[in-house]
């Protein structure tokens, strides 16, 4: 089994740890930290996007300078959403206000509003909206990179199995090319927001598996 850059992911370096027993939100940070302490790189399958904050909290203990590539229809920069500061709509506000990442680059955004634009300016977020997207303009990363892929970053034609459909999104080829263009160390990743109840003939599941393969090829 190979990624498109011919990296084999049938490797003893890759081990499926199965499902974790999460009783409390912060168990995510603890379990991530335990694996990082053993020298592992971690690829997490969500779950909604709220999981990314505790995962990055754990990574920040190991990586003092961390870049994040977020592929998403939404900025997820709300200070609070429906009274919850740890909502799926808030993880990157928590990450950036805590200084856990040097740089946050968002690709695929097509739901920007005034509040999140203000948050993006506050945290110096590099947003690449779909309305004027040119993948060639996405700058190179200089620090260890964490990739967070929200499946609703894709156009619903490619990924119907998400909770929040946002037309006008990324194609599968655009995201593959974006991943293949990365030339810095990828130290971790997540894929989030897959909703099997809204999928059609497992289209989104197959796409998520393809993206996992391509990202794993960058991690080993």
Where do the model's predicted regions map?
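Conserved alpha-helical scaffold segments that buttress catalytic/binding sites
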Residues: 1-220
């Amino acid at each position: 089994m190979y990624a498109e850059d011919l990296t084999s992911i049938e490797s003893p370096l890759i081990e499926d740890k199965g499902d974790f027993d999460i009783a409390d939100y912060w168990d995510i940070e603890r379990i991530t930290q335990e694996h990082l302490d053993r020298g592992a790189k971690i690829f997490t399958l969500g779950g909604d996007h709220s999981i990314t904050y505790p995962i990055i909290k754990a990574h920040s203990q190991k990586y003092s300078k961390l870049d994040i590539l977020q592929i998403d229809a939404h900025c997820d920069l709300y200070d609070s959403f429906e009274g919850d500061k740890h909502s799926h709509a808030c993880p990157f506000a928590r990450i950036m206000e805590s200084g856990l990442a040097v740089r946050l680059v968002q690709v695929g955004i097509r739901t920007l509003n005034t509040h999140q634009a203000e948050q993006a300016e506050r945290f110096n977020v590099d947003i690449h909206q779909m309305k004027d997207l040119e993948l060639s303009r996405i700058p190179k990363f200089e620090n260890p990179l964490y990739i967070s892929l929200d499946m609703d970053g894709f156009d619903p034609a490619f990924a119907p199995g998400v909770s929040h459909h946002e037309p006008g999104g990324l194609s599968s080829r655009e995201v593959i090319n974006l991943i293949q263009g990365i030339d810095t160390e990828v130290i971790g990743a997540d894929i989030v927001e897959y909703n099997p109840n809204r999928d059609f003939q497992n289209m989104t599941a197959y796409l998520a598996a393809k993206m996992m393969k391509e990202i794993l090829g960058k991690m080993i």
